[in-house]
Amino acid sequence: MIASDLLRRIRNDLPMPVTIAALGREGPPCKMSEGYFRFVCPRCGEMRATVNPRNNLAHCFSCKKNLNNIDLLISLDYDFLSAVTLLEQWLNQYQTRQATQKTPATPPPP
């Protein structure tokens, strides 16, 4: 059984641009435009899916569908369990990188 807290963290704490970057060539084409991260909607094929940075949810302005990280991987033919497992790995890697970048440098001993 997958913990609901893990699903919440995957949806909210792993930025969609990080997920799409991790997918590489397998992921949808994307770009920054007018301060928003946009990508080709995997459902309709239009470059009109835009990520709202406040809630980490993508909305396609062509087909009117919403996507989170899990939905994105499922739309790319991952099954639910494989998607959650992979996204959990990427979330852990992302959080480790974030923690490493925020760690202050220790001053040299006197």
Regions found by a protein language model. Name each.
Residues 1-110:
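N-terminal structured subdomain of primase-like DNA metabolism proteins
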